[in-house]
Amino acid sequence: MPVMKGLLAPQNTFLDTIATRFDGTHSNFILANAQVAKGFPIVYCSDGFCELAGFARTEVMQKSCSCKFLFGVETNEQLMLQIEKSLEEKVEFKGEIMFYKKNGAPFWCLLDIVPIKNEKGDVVLFLASFKDITDTKVKITSEDKKEDRTKGRSRAGSHFDSARRRSRAVLYHISGHLQRREKNKLKINNNVFVDKPAFPEYKASDAKKSKFILLHFSTFKAGWDWLILLATFYVAVTVPYNVCFIGNEDLSTTRSTTVSDIAVEILFIIDIILNFRTTYVSKSGQVIFEARSICIHYVTTWFIIDLIAALPFDLLYAFNVTVVSLVHLLKTVRLLRLLRLLQKLDRYSQHSTIVLTLLMSMFALLAHWMACIWYVIGKMEREDNSLLKWEVGWLHELGKRLESPYYGNNTLGGPSIRSAYIAALYFTLSSLTSVGFGNVSANTDAEKIFSICTMLIGALMHALVFGNVTAIIQRMYSRWSLYHTRTKDLKDFIRVHHLPQQLKQRMLEYFQTTWSVNNGIDSNELLKDFPDELRSDITMHLNKEILQLSLFECASRGCLRSLSLHIKTSFCAPGEYLLRQGDALQAIYFVCSGSMEVLKDSMVLAILGKGDLIGANLSIKDQVIKTNADVKALTYCDLQCIILKGLFEVLGLYPEYAHKFVEDIQHDLTYNLREGHESDVISRLSNKSTVSQAEPKGNGSINKRLPSIVEDEEEEEVEEEETTSLSPIYTRGSSVSHSKKTGSNKTYLGLSLKQLASGTVPFHSPIRVSSANSPKTKQEADPPNHGRKKEKNLKVQLSSLGSAGTPELSPRIVDGIEDGNSNEETQTFDFGSEQIRPEPRISPPLAESEIGAAFLFIKAEETKQQINKLNSEVTTLTQEVSQLGRDMRSIMQLLENILSPQQPSQFCSLHPTPMCPSRESLQTRVSWSAHQPCLHLQAGGAHLYHGNVASGIWSVDPSLVGSSPQRTEAHEQNPADSELHHSPNLDYSPSHCQVIQEGHLQFLRCISPHSDTTLTPLQSISATLSSSVCSSSETSLHLVLPSRSEEGSITHGPVSSFSLENLPGSWDREQMMSASSERLENFPVEVVTSTADVKDSKAINV
């Protein structure tokens, strides 16, 4: 029959063995990884060592096994070298050395370092024990001084040897025996008795089972249990029958069952012997194979009952030993074997048919027992001397009906024992199942009382067994039914998908183990209907172990209640991997029981025990955290895990605690699984010797410096060019300085206007122009400097702190006006060094120069990739903002043209023109200046200037071009400040226009002359002005006018010299409109010009 097997997977109990044989985890010892050649990092430290040295476990983990952090001023340098040498050669070291605690207090320590091997014989760990011998050392030193003064010599050596022997006894105790060397003993052949290893091996130990140990779930044991079950039922039937019906009256009948009784007794005795050699399942769910533990367990549980039930009373009859009748009653003790049936009832209740069979058997057994009692009552009344009773007893009535009455004072005659038993059983069964039929009835008082009890018991049994068999099965065995249903589903799944035997075994063991832990109860499903308040209290009680960590001391009760809802319970079997390298970390794990190891490339990086926390340092903005190593279970482990998704939700609800949690978790983690963290540890260990030379001797402390990037100093021009190439956003000053290097302002402005005409430059306004050269253009323009930038030597410093979060970058356009010295100094964005995790700035030894160079190259490449990614994101955002600005300006222009009211044209007085335009000025141009602007707006009581337009030519005296039109300082007014000069053609005299005050906008429209010319009449040229500030000290705009060629065809090229000879002297002003608004500065400054050569009659938006 199927039985719960228990936990059989091989476990690596190395940590438990060390802790147990060291008298608990409070002993002073550490374990270090012997497979990492540089530094031999510590993978486990006991609580006693932390108390001795004054360091926390998180501060000791991953430090060097040589314990340089305990060295001080008076530490013997020769012993330091010997420790390093013994670690390199992987040999044992013992010695007395002066160490220093965290607070700087010195103490003498007896240090013993022993290598630990695995099953292959390779040294994988170092076990270092520490014993404080300060008191002994001081006492011995004082005694030595006294002896030196009296005898002139020292005897301290013997005391040192005794102290060393006392400390070595602890390590020898780990092997399970003390090495005793006795003289006068014969040497035993090593081939027969091989010495056990001095220390336990670091490996997964298989269950060692002797061939004389019987598995409790084996097939033989299952068949034996069925045989013992039948023997138990035999005892339950025959013992009451022999006591009540036979007694000492019919020894022949008794002797007929003697053989079967002796056989049953022999079976019980053999069962006792087998129980001393049968495994059992402990309370923790593990299978116990040790013979001594099995014996102790059996003796303290069922041995006494089984021994009494197996006493061979029937052997007394076999050897013709006369016994009194009371000895027969001792056989009723065998009924205690039924208690064993109750113990194994859960094993037999796996199927409904077995359950029904057992219930019916128990019902029949109860009827048998009550029949025996019913016969004893009739027999006692028959033997009574009262004549009034024996005549009405049920046996007397039965004898009359069977025509075998009693006679001779009721001692002779009467029905046979067989007939009496059948009649008694018939009466009890009819009474238990119904009210009886009356053919066998109770006549005396005793019989009536027994009949009443039988009816009550029958009603109860009938209701429980026959009336509610289905309800009994569902209520009593529903959990087992669910267990076997799921087990059957699991086996069907394995059979359908043809899973291998190893995977099948793992699945079955995991299912059985998890079922034994939670008994098939889904806590989430069970608690989902409870209110949140009650559910939070329940989960806080269930997860109180992890919530009592120092990590959650600063959390409020509400935060803990919310967090407890996101804590789950997990289980891991020996050899199972909790996490694989490169997996996405989904939770933070807390080890409740068992031990685990952290592996990378088959090397042990850390050993985790009860109370350890494993995960990664967090950031609020983290999306995916990849693990850097494997986490494998050594024993059966119970875990509690905090789901990261729920954790981030809770931290979002409690921001005052979130920052504290992010800071504290990196100190409370026993091992950090964040990808990239282990390279920092190995690098720190590999350079430990170099760093220790720079640090002063004394107690080691953790260095906590902010990460930084230190670059080699170069020329100032190279720094400016490299800074410009870091980001797609440039300042106005850098653009102007670059234009001065490449050419004149006129050439640079001409290039910008060509780009504007083609629509490739995303300007925000006609007077807000910021040159933004792409990185590609920059590299093409200056390849030598770009090459020098790649060859730049980066020196990187690493902090022991965890990685910081990525800084937020807000893309924006930096105008040159933000800094008064923008034309002299280049403004760039400073990307913080917190987003980069560099290595310590150290000078590696010559043997490690290649490793350091390769590591720096990798870090530099990662940094470049991050910067390029940021540049692309900022560029994309800038383009989107520019496109949005252009769309908004187009919409505002349309609204202004629609909503602005029309007014009659206002003409200005004539103003003499000092000169006629030359061919170089025959290009339409709009210029702004501080003294004589063409279009000028000044916020807050400023004046709006405008000028008329003639022949499509606007010009301003170049000598009057000044600083930015945004200047608000007052300047001396003169008549020329409120007028606009323009260059007329031929004999036309220009006019100057009046000033329009404050909240007005003016719209001017000019059309081509009405006189006959060789030039085709143009469409109207319009200019509108709205009121925002200017962002450029100088902006020029080129317009292309259509012209007529000599053959008379219309062209759309630029105006040539011969086509302008017949240009009229003036253009007629078609109309002038002005509109008012509340605040002119709310409108963007823009100039919109439209000519015939624009496709689809669309305006050129600047």
From Swiss-Prot:
Sequence ranges assigned to domain PAC in this UniProt record: 93-145
A cellular-component GO term for this protein: monoatomic ion channel complex
Motif (Selectivity filter): 434-439
Domain spans labelled PAS: 18-90
SS bonds (residue pairs): none
GO annotation (BP), single: potassium ion transport
This protein's UniProt keywords: Glycoprotein, Ion channel, Ion transport, Membrane, Potassium, Potassium channel, Potassium transport, Transmembrane, Transmembrane helix, Transport, Voltage-gated channel
Region (cNMP-binding domain): 551-668
InterPro entries in the cross-refs: cNMP-bd_dom, cNMP-bd_dom_sf, Ion_trans_dom, K_chnl_volt-dep_EAG/ELK/ERG, K_chnl_volt-dep_ELK, KCNH_animal-type, PAC, PAS
Keyword Calcium included in the entry's annotation: no
Annotated family: Belongs to the potassium channel family. H (Eag) (TC 1.A.1.20) subfamily. Kv12.1/KCNH8 sub-subfamily.
Job of this protein: Pore-forming (alpha) subunit of a voltage-gated delayed rectifier potassium channel that mediates outward-rectifying potassium currents. Elicits a slowly activating, non-inactivating and slowly deactivation outwards potassium current at depolarizating voltages from -30 mV to +50mV. Shows no obvious change in the activation rate from different holding potentials. Activation is strongly dependent on the pH of the external solution.
Listed name of the protein: Voltage-gated delayed rectifier potassium channel KCNH8
Organism annotation: Mus musculus (Mouse)
UniProt lineage: Eukaryota, Metazoa, Chordata, Craniata, Vertebrata
